[in-house]
Amino acid sequence: MNLILAILLMVVCLLAGFFLGTWFSQRQTKKLLMDNPPLNEDAVRLMMGSMGRKPSEVQVQQVLRQIRAAAKQSDTNKK
């Protein structure tokens, strides 16, 4: 009986550790992407330049704020 209980306890602890580790790493990844979005100022300038526009610094910052706001809003909508 003790052997079955020990094995069951190990399996439960392994599953709990797996799910907690997955949850924690997902949370850290979301936080990292919110703090450092993959689209930076140079990428926005390049994208606007490829569309034939010469963006000012104000326009670049406005686009970045819109991207961050949209990401934050989609994150809060999922909760």
Swiss-Prot record:
Keywords assigned: Cell membrane, Membrane, Transmembrane, Transmembrane helix
Main localization, broad class: membrane
UniProt feature coiled coil, ranges: none
Membrane topology category: Single-pass membrane protein
InterPro entries: UPF0154
Regions that span the bilayer: 4-24
GO cellular component, one term: plasma membrane
Subcellular location: Cell membrane
HAMAP family xref list: UPF0154
Similarity comment: family membership: Belongs to the UPF0154 family.
Protein name listed in UniProt: UPF0154 protein llmg_1186
